[in-house]
Amino acid sequence: MRSIPEMMKINNIKTTYAVIGSRSVNANIDHILSERISKHDTIISGGAIGIDTMAAEWANANGISTIVIKPNYAVYGKKAPLIRNKEIALACDTMIAIWDGKSKGTLNAINHAKKAGKHVEIIRV
């Protein structure tokens, strides 16, 4: 049985993917993204160093629309990254989390997406 993202890709349904992950991860994510994301999709990035930046760079290199939602420290102070995580979770159709199993920020975003009923794919690295 195919996953929801696979079926959407096959049927050319536009999907908005949040691609998030641990800052400590320095993995090649090209194959992960190219297997899941089509030219007509959109990637949402949190703009953080690591997976967020790599995903945005991959999208730009492949002509895929990108939205970067950065934390608004001026308004929310030190809670800004957590509020940004919730905004990303609410804005996406599917979340791809490339996670080291330790990052609390990535876990926070995963939990927001699950609570919002979004499809979440966790790739442990």
Q: How would you name each of these model-derived features?
A:
Residues M1:
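Non-catalytic, low-structured ubiquitin/UBL-interacting segments
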Residues I4-V125:
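Acidic/glycine-enriched connector segments
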